[in-house]
Amino acid sequence: MHNLIPTVIENTGNYERVFDIYSRLLRERIIFLSGEINDPKADTVIAQLLFLESEDSSKDIYLYLNSPGGSITAGLAIYDTMQYIKPDVRTICIGQAASMGAFLLAGGAKGKRESLTYSRIMIHQPWGGISGQASDINIQANEILRLKKLIIDIMSNQIGVDKEKLALDMERDYFMTSSDALKYGLIDSILVRE
């Protein structure tokens, strides 16, 4: 199956320029993060965030999310960059923001975390496949517990939900509609056509 990226032709008087759709949207300060969050995708998103900050640190950046989640370390790298740069990062869920996708959605600037009407959001505890010697399994289990606490601490601070409640809700897959996510504090508004 081919993954075709649409192009846009921009006509500016004397010449035409052809852009892939993502490059054209980047000019409007829009970044798309779709699919599994992994190191290569994180590198691309981080580079785009840093580029847009260097272009104009006073204008918001729009991060559209449609992700089932993915790597904790890749997600934390994106989150850290979102918090580090000067522009506010508006997060918008389109489709779904699950696991690390929900974490990044909640990591947007307060008051600027949004979702489309029929998107779904899901939070849960970190998980990982562990194998090896008993001592290695113990080391990995301790690291997963450390990351779980870190994610809960950060999300609790971002969305204003008590750490104990958040930890309990994250014990299993916790699915939310946009309305549920709004009540929960994961998002600040639901986008509808005006």
UniProtKB/Swiss-Prot annotation:
EC numbers on record: 3.4.21.92
Active-site residues, as the UniProt record annotates them: S99 (nucleophile), H124
Catalytic activity: Hydrolysis of proteins to small peptides in the presence of ATP and magnesium. alpha-casein is the usual test substrate. In the absence of ATP, only oligopeptides shorter than five residues are hydrolyzed (such as succinyl-Leu-Tyr-|-NHMec, and Leu-Tyr-Leu-|-Tyr-Trp, in which cleavage of the -Tyr-|-Leu- and -Tyr-|-Trp bonds also occurs)
Subcellular location: Cytoplasm
Keywords: Cytoplasm, Hydrolase, Protease, Serine protease
Keyword Cytoplasm recorded: yes
SUPFAM superfamilies according to UniProt: ClpP/crotonase
A single GO BP: protein quality control for misfolded or incompletely synthesized proteins
Annotated GO CC locations: cytoplasm; endopeptidase Clp complex
Protein name per UniProt: ATP-dependent Clp protease proteolytic subunit 1
